[in-house]
């Protein structure tokens, strides 16, 4: 995906293992919009510890020149991921990033009905509720239906969504 030099975009960066939270804190200090999906788990002493869901991956929303300045001059310890096909910085489309964030932020457990059964891998759109507008594929796990959203073809997030909220595309 190609963007203009001064257009905001989501860039994909890699931080060293275990430094994701530090990179997040530095980006917050600089006032840069970013996203690192995390979860809270119990550490070995029973304390709650925040850990990244996707090891080493950081998403930074910035212009291309500002993104490069962050790494070279602002002290953000990360390297950008390059798209192998275009040999340019990897960029995530805004819609895909928004869908991915919304699905990670919310999971619903209610049930509902559709006019016909869903099949595995079928493309659906959520038509109501907090995930309205999100598009993804249907996955069934232990008898429950989930909407699965893919980011860059290799990162996946899922949320249980009532069947009545889904529209088959």
What residue spans do the PLM features occupy?
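Short coil-to-beta-strand transition motifs
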Residues: 120, 127-134
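Short beta-strand-centered aromatic/proline hotspots
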Residues: 133-141
């Amino acid at each position: 995906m190609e963007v203009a030099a001064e257009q905001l975009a989501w860039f994909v960066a890699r931080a060293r293992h275990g430094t994701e939270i530090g990179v997040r804190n530095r980006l917050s200090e600089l006032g840069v919009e970013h996203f690192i999906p995390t979860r809270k788990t119990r550490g070995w002493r029973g304390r709650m510890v925040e850990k990244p869901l996707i090891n080493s991956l950081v998403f930074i929303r910035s212009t291309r020149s500002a993104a490069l300045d962050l790494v070279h001059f602002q002290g953000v310890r990360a390297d950008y991921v390059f798209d192998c096909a275009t040999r340019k910085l990897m960029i995530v489309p805004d819609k895909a990033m928004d869908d991915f964030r919304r699905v990670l932020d919310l999971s619903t457990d209610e049930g509902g009905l559709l006019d016909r059964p869903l099949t595995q891998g079928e493309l659906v759109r959520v038509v109501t509720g907090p995930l309205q507008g999100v598009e993804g594929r249907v996955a069934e796990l232990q008898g429950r239906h989930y909407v699965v959203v893919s980011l860059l073809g290799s990162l996946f997030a899922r949320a249980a969504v009532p069947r009545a909220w889904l529209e088959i595309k």
